[in-house]
């Protein structure tokens, strides 16, 4: 079964200049993900960064907002539990990954997402972290090729020095152990989806997921009529020609 790398990101290690909003009037309510403008900022920032990957990616899906995941992300943020949620609390019709950001400053969503993405500096594509203690799992989830839905929530946790708690959920989940350091396929943008491309990102998402990492092999060995594949390899069996 596919395994997920469990990581969290401590925003307090970043310089205050990156985290602190320049506007003195900025309040937590302005970051509420119930606002359409905030949802658009989060989705747009993710898509912008997915277009910027190096080496360029041939099969990165364009991301969109997921309202069910928004509910889950906000509920977890409200708990002020500074650790990852169990997988059952971040599952919609798909299992979702999770990035956490904690800050003593009221950071913009774009700053939080950029902080995760900046881990790319510590990763050699298709090889691994440049240093043994480097954290790169937030970056790989942000740019995981088959993830096409995102939603987030934020809460204030006054009892903690890192009082602002940001949670984003990514569906379907990324960071499979089998290819953790290869979050997408290197190549010309949209080379894997020439007929389904929008500004360098693919639009042929699947809507299903594989629960096993060897579904392609299982399909050849057993065929999609087998009960094992019907339950655990829906993407492989139902999404031919789509990114999954």
Curated annotation (Swiss-Prot):
State the SMART domains in the record: SCP
Q: Which cysteine pairs are joined by S-S bonds? A: 190-197, 193-202, 206-239, 215-233, 224-237
Q: Where in the cell is it found?
A: Cytoplasmic vesicle, Secretory vesicle
Taken from the UniProt entry, a GO cellular component term is: transport vesicle
Q: Superkingdom of this entry's organism? A: Eukaryota
Span of the signal peptide? 1-19
- Family stated for the protein in its record: Belongs to the CRISP family.
What does this protein do, in the record's words? This protein is supposed to help spermatozoa undergo functional maturation while they move from the testis to the ductus deferens.
Supply the name of the protein. Cysteine-rich secretory protein 1
What organism does this protein naturally occur in? Mus musculus (Mouse)
Organismal lineage = Eukaryota, Metazoa, Chordata, Craniata, Vertebrata
| Gene (name only) | Crisp1
């Amino acid at each position: 079964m596919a395994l997920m790398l469990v990581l969290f990101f401590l925003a307090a290690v970043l310089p205050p200049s990156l985290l602190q909003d320049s506007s003195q009037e900025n309040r937590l309510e302005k970051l509420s993900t119930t606002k359409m403008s905030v949802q658009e900022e989060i989705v747009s920032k993710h898509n912008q960064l997915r277009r910027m990957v190096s080496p360029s990616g041939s099969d990165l899906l364009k991301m969109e907002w997921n309202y069910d995941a928004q509910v889950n992300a906000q509920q977890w943020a409200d708990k002020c539990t500074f650790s990852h949620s169990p997988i059952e609390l971040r599952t919609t019709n798909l299992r979702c990954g999770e990035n956490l950001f904690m800050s003593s400053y009221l950071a913009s969503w774009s700053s939080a997402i950029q902080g995760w993405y900046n881990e790319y500096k510590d990763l050699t594509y298709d090889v691994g972290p440049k240093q043994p203690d480097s954290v790169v799992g937030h970056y790989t989830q942000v740019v995981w090729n088959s993830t096409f839905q995102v939603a987030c929530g934020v809460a204030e946790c006054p009892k903690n020095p890192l009082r602002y708690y940001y949670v984003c959920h990514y569906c379907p989940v990324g960071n499979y152990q089998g290819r953790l350091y290869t979050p997408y396929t290197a190549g010309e943008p949209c080379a894997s989806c020439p007929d389904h491309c929008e500004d360098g990102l693919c639009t042929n998402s699947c809507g299903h997921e594989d629960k096993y990492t060897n579904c392609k092999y299982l399909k050849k060995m057993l065929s999609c009529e087998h009960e094992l594949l019907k339950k655990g390899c829906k993407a492989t069996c139902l999404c031919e020609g789509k990114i999954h």
